[in-house]
């Protein structure tokens, strides 16, 4: 349908799949009423000094597997707060509505009014609990496009209940039955993909009425708990028969193995990967000794090196005795898997230490450690707590403009 405004000569051309009762010029906001003969007569004019912007009239997009056309837009105002509502019509006579508030979009459809009368503060609908967010009486400040009704000139009573990302909206005129809409958050990027607007859409400001959190915290917690349980069960299955095993223990003489390696007998490790703990002991006395250990995989010739100093000092000064260090120490080589291995050990001591004769080296293949699992559990718990308090903060901010906020 093409209509040229009598007041400003601006043409409006949109494919309209319904009988038009009212037309509003998008340039000067002149209101025209359809006559019985199909003509349009000037009725009034909205006093609105801004451009509506947003989605242009005539844009088409596919929603719910059906093509819809933007046939009209209404600007509503309440206490100097403005928002836009777009009318979308399909060729089969279906209507959908898009509400844009501060860059946040909600897709609405009319549903049967089988709710309790009045404005209940809580509604159970489709297994969701909707809570009353606001009751307002806005007016239509401006409009543009084609409409199948006469747009109301008085105040509209609205009640909005939310269960993000959904909402239920009640609208009622003074002498008419109320209309009920079910809304769902739709992202700005989705709007762009569906309608491909040529003009930039408004940027988001604040938290939208039904804007969802970045992710579902409850689902995140369930997923992380499931992952933790799976890891724990796998760990128990792999290591259920794992026992601590001493695979090597021997005293190594400093004089016999001076400047040469001690090669241990080969040993075989079976089962899942576990840490190999190397314990060293030497009779150091105000002196030091050192052990360098190479774990050699005889199947792959892969070598893992580590070394450990053993130091023990003691004395008496300023009327008090003191000690530092120990004659024993240990260290671990983590994640050693099954296979055949041997140790190549080099031991040295302080040249001035004439009393210390050797060092005892013991290698123990330990039981699997739960340390990594507990660290993972702690990290996951921290993630869930951060997500929970982030979502809580998000909800507090969402409800801060509502007189019915549950966070006071």
What name fits each language-model region?
Residues 218-225, 367-385:
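N-terminal membrane-entry
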Residues 1, 21:
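Short metal-coordination and nucleic-acid-contact micro-motifs, chiefly zinc-binding Cys/His arrays
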Residues 3, 11, 15-16, 26, ...:
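Short, surface-exposed polybasic-aromatic patches that bind anionic ligands, especially phosphate groups
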Residues 97-145, 244-332:
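Membrane-proximal low-complexity regions enriched in glycine and acidic/polar residues
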